[in-house]
């Protein structure tokens, strides 16, 4: 009892106190608030946790120290765990804190439950604020829990950044009891998906032609073990005219398993090849330019820059990059580089290769020349050289800039130049290539009144009573479902549209208000609203993926106004000691019960006497005066009022875009979204929301910025708020995936084929190769011809790498080369055009109309990754096999193929001929297939599998031409899509991201920004909906589609219908079965009665189906 009285006495004098909870062990102290100073300026930095299973480290009572933070400096709310500790652990004390109002006093009750008896301490103090607040705190909001370490993966940290004596005062400015109904409250639903008749399967039959060269099945008399070859090369650059050369002579290293034999060594054309074991050193390219600086950050990419119009390195003395802890043994941990002289002309100087020793310092030297070298597109040239030496032989690690430009040259002239016939909306402009597939497409085409989905908000041009820009956030309880099947699974999930919760407006705006959209990047754009008669009076609204605030910046003499179609219930002015100086805070509760926080920041420190928001009606709030440079920030108030402090600490700073940067050591990739910010906040950071799949690959440091604030997205689960200016990631790359069949079951095991399997493969390949591939693609659009050419590239791989028949390999290679020549000469049915308006390569198929869909809308940037992925993979296979036969096909045609890569996935802003990352959305973790089309439900993607098929193709093409940046970037995209697609597209039974109402569907169907629709654009058959997320089945498929998921999907959706399906979809579904049951899959394709004309479309071969399922069936049995 004496202990309780002592604690009570202490609490009566200190509002934020240091309390020790004593357990059974008299020498064990559990620190709950690590703070000693009573200064009002001091900020507590600690780690409260959600009350789950945790362990507590024993600490010394004297080990704590006060922490203080300057409001103008960025705060990292890091763990306080520098204390001396031992290894003994105990069950954590479970804390709860509650505050409740009692007239003019606040009673504060803190309770602690140990393994024995509860301990309770109360503190009552006077509250002089004009209005008291009630709130409930649990463990996740208690300040300063120290040395608490998570013991389970489900543990979530909550950053604490609280003023020691934080206080809030409130004053109600407006209250209304007006009732609302109809669209004001519920919005409108857009659920229809237009259906077409174009089937993704290739129905045109091949053009048969007798081939003299055939495989002799009887010659295959023994079983074979196939050693999977992973080719890693340094950059061998085939440069175009007038380009700057910055590359080293091509060289390659082939990696074999430890039991490989010397006769497996293949010599690549124009390269110096040597077999090596994985522990031997490798070469990695850093180009076109890399700037390395000493850093203690675990995120290396932020120290890489590209500057200048030509490649040039900038290195500092004694570089100490820090690499992810998950990387393998040959990791650089301390200063490894000596001073590098880069003082010579930067015109063509570059750092080509770094060898990093795990035990010795490496000296890097670089020679350069200002000489400009001109070469033809088919030549390989070197104008610089770099060497790296170590004092002794040792294993090395290497670093690759993942976002090196593929090229900065003009696309080949074989592509005609012409501006796209699609018209942009008025007021749309950009300094550089215009993005065609990003979240803001609705703002640049059509009426410009459909929303941009900037998770967690949607925003759109508002032209009703309050002209301006509307902001909406919908919650999980506003999801609508419909079309339930007999198992209770909903056909669709849809969010309401058109609920203008708040509207950025101005008293000056009317129906003549103009809208401009500019500064378009892969992550952001800017909307500018202005008076029609005076453009100096304008409102700018930056739209950035992940933004925690909707922000409007008022310029000129605009008189700010906030509107709402829902209507205002109450408006309260608040003050908070957690705000940076000069920020005014308001709490706006709408008539539907939703509360928004509003922060007002002026160019000079604002006070409530100088400026205020005034209510003019239930639907309008007006500023008391016009202020040039006024900033208004709006955010949905968190459900946990304790977490509101983080919005306070973030207010005043807003984001304008983010830069994408990353590096890889060959097995792990680290990358980040580095946000550009404006303004100042109390914490030096702002609020950024992350999607569920981000959490799977966050770097450890991100847990220190977690706030506990959660907001629902429209179709991608719950987002978490972070007090930060960057999102940082580290992820492992699956480097087992290469040319030949692979599954997660196979892992690092070797492929094996029996002689009987090889003989059947030979017979089927002989039959399927009796064609003219050139004639077989005649009359096909870009999508279909890509599928057909790629079909034969997989047969070529099978003949070359599995059957290993040289004569048939050569004849098949020539057959497919002849077909590809049609593309290289741009003489296919719908030639490609370089679009000078949107800076991309498009099909001419729909040049005359946006509604014809002859080429699935490729002309207007639909499906480019689907179409070009097949072509790029075929090119990679041709180049790979050709190089083994001492050919130079890849080097000769590199620029043409690279143009397709650049159109879809240009990684660098330095490439001015193509939009950066046109299709792949790095924030969402997958691509968007829809191009320049307005849609009220936002962007969409139907075929997830053809999305990652592009990344796989790009990876292999990068390996073929020695572009390791491209190769590893493909690996990174695959890794990201594995997380994203298993959250949003594929619904394993334990999926916790999407609602249970649709989990039973097993796949999304078409995933939109605003709706998940279990259907396809070409029909509602079950095999269509699931098959479009399967095709094509390739070595990368199992990395994305897990064995568990595929089996669940098979049992619930496919097995009940498979016997009734007799079409090309049958072959797709059965080959997909090989990802979990390759034995049964192989039995289907090897059956003597198998009918290819019934079960396969012309985009799929029986040869590859047998090679894929058969190899896996043998190797994992």
UniProtKB/Swiss-Prot annotation:
Class in the EC hierarchy, top level: hydrolase
PTM section of the record: Glycosylated.
Span of domain GH81: 400-1117
Localisation: Secreted, Cell wall
Active site feature: 863, 942, 946
Record field: catalytic activity: Hydrolysis of (1->3)-beta-D-glucosidic linkages in (1->3)-beta-D-glucans
Annotated spans, alpha/beta subdomain: 639-732
Location of the region described as (alpha/beta)6 barrel subdomain in the Swiss-Prot/TrEMBL record: 747-1117
Gene3D superfamilies: Golgi alpha-mannosidase II, domain 4 (2.70.98.30), Immunoglobulin FC, subunit C (1.20.5.420)
Region Disordered: start-end pairs: 66-88, 365-393
Record function comment: Cleaves internal linkages in 1,3-beta-glucan. Involved in the dissolution of the mother-daughter septum during cell separation.
Name of this chain's protein: Glucan endo-1,3-beta-D-glucosidase 1
Species this protein is from: Saccharomyces cerevisiae (strain ATCC 204508 / S288c) (Baker's yeast)
Lineage of source species: Eukaryota, Fungi, Dikarya, Ascomycota, Saccharomycotina
The gene coding this protein: DSE4
